[in-house]
């Protein structure tokens, strides 16, 4: 049953010499930017395919008087993982490939390496640009990650969502308001 329920790749991770010794019981996909297609369509926004397009869209959303991103990093004693997820993504896309990323992870290059600093500069575009984040920059570190996306499902007096995009792993749908969970994949998507 296990072999039919999971990809051969996942099965292979727990297999040695043709014998399955262990296996995945869950998987979470990272690097997802969640959005609500209906909200994009209603305003004529296109789904960005590049970082530059995402920044241009964020600028447009701000110019339209709204907030592009929900962003929360508070996670009790483990708050750093949310920024790390962003940094990992950006480094893999803007750095010198997986070899440099692997060096960073194994502490063979320092946090002040130009590749790491470049990734931090990209992330800073989201975190420190006025109007980009619900509650502003200061709210990022005090907003619980599990509630960070809530404004995406709430409307202001003009019928606009509190934010349009939220970057988080696939597990975040279990934190969504109940009505949004029922519509996952249709009301809100990646």
Region roles according to the model:
Residues 17-19, 90, 94, 176-190:
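Ligand-binding "clamshell"
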């Amino acid at each position: 049953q296990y072999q039919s329920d999971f990809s051969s790749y996942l099965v292979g991770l727990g297999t040695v010499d043709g014998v399955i010794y262990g296996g995945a019981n869950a998987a979470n996909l990272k690097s997802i930017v969640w959005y609500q297609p209906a909200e994009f369509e209603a305003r004529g926004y296109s789904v960005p395919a590049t970082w530059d397009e995402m920044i241009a869209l964020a600028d447009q959303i701000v110019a339209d008087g709204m907030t592009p991103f929900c962003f929360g990093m508070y996670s009790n004693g483990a708050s750093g993982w949310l920024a790390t997820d962003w940094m990992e993504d950006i480094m893999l896309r803007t750095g010198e490939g997986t070899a440099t990323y692997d060096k960073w992870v194994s502490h063979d290059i320092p946090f002040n390496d130009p590749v790491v600093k470049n990734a931090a500069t990209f992330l800073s575009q989201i975190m420190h640009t006025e109007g980009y984040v619900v509650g502003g920059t200061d709210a990022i570190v005090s907003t619980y990650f599990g509630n960070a996306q809530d404004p995406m499902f709430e409307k202001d007096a003009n019928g606009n969502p509190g934010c349009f995009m939220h970057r988080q792993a696939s597990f975040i749908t279990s934190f969504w308001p109940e009505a949004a969970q029922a519509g996952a994949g249709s009301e809100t998507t990646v």
